[in-house]
C-alpha cells in the first residue's frame, strides 16, 4: 500500500533528521515491505552508515541503484556513488568449511542460515560480534563468537575439521609430584 509506505518513510525521515537513526531503521524497513522506493533505500543506507553498519549501508545503496535504474530514476548515479564511497569500509567474514562437512553441515550466523554460496568466500558483514553455530550431525554443535572489526576488516573463521568429542585426549596428569632419586633408591654416580 503506497500510502502506508509513504507514512512510514516520513516517520523514518523525521527520526533520521532528528539524529535518531537507530529508531529510524524500523520505519524505513517497514516502508520497504509496502513499496520499494529509491528515497527509502537511500535514507536507510544513510542511517546504516551513520550507525557504522557499513555492509548494510552498502547493500542499501546498491539496491537503491538497481531500483533507480529499473525505474529510470535520476538518483541512480547518486546511489552508485554512495555505494562506491564506502566500498573500502565494508568488512567481511570468511567461514572456511572442510570438504568432509560440506554436504552435511548447517551454518548459522547470528541465528540466520548462512547459505552455502557464502561458504569459503569473504562475505560483507557489519562490524561487531557475530555468533556462529555449526550443526553437522552426529558431531556436537560447534558455537563460537567472532568479532569483525570496522574499516574493511577481513575476519576468518574455520569450522573444526575433527569432532572435538572424538579427538584423542592426552592422558591425565598426575597430581602426585615425581619421586626424587632418594625415594626410589636410584642414586646418581658422581662421574
What is each of the regions a protein language model found here?
Residues 1-191:
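Acidic, Pro/Ser/Gly/Ala-rich intrinsically disordered segments
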